[in-house]
């Protein structure tokens, strides 16, 4: 299906000023984006989105916001990187039950985000978002 690529291409062809004007369409006094505002905005921007397209796009925005909030919660120092120190004290049920040590659980958690080319014991926001975006497809 080439429709999503064509829509993305149309957005990009509008340049920065087009994207800025699209952003203005979504701003109201609540500083939140409703599904109705998104639908109206993409229509005014000249994009032909079906209701299903708008629903999918809105759902993707909501998922990303939830993942970003989870990362922010884990990043205790606010430096944009989750380390063992950040997640100490966030106990798994296995630790509480004595089935695993805190260190084992922390290592297992961090290893979920490591690639064969990058084993540093840290999780960046990009790694966190990439991991969870892959799970929700």
Swiss-Prot record:
Coiled-coil regions listed: none
Entry protein name: Crustacean calcium-binding protein 23
Keywords tagged on the record: Calcium, Disulfide bond, Metal-binding, Repeat
Key word Secreted present: no
Quaternary state and interactors: Monomer or disulfide-linked dimers.
Other comments on record: This protein binds calcium.
UniProt KW Disulfide bond keyword: yes
Signal peptide limits: none
Species this protein is from: Homarus americanus
General function of this protein: Possibly acts as a regulatory protein and not as a calcium buffer or transport protein.
Family matches, as PROSITE patterns: EF_HAND_2
Record-annotated EF-hand domain positions: 27-48, 62-97, 100-135
GO molecular function list: calcium ion binding
InterPro entries from the UniProt entry: Ca-bind_SignalingProt, EF-hand-dom_pair, EF_hand_dom
């Amino acid at each position: 299906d080439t429709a999503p690529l064509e829509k993305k291409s149309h957005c990009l062809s509008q340049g920065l000023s087009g994207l800025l004007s699209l952003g203005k369409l979504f701003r109201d006094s609540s500083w939140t984006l409703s599904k109705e505002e998104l639908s109206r905005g993409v229509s005014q921007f000249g994009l032909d989105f079906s209701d299903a397209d708008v629903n999918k796009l809105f759902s993707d925005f909501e998922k990303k916001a939830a993942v970003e909030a989870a990362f922010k919660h884990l990043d205790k120092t606010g430096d944009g990187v989750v380390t063992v120190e950040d997640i100490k004290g966030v106990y798994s049920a296995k630790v509480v039950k004595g089935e695993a040590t805190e260190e084992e659980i922390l290592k297992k958690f961090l290893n979920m985000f490591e690639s064969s080319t990058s084993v540093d014991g840290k999780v960046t926001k990009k790694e966190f978002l990439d991991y969870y975006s892959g799970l929700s497809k």
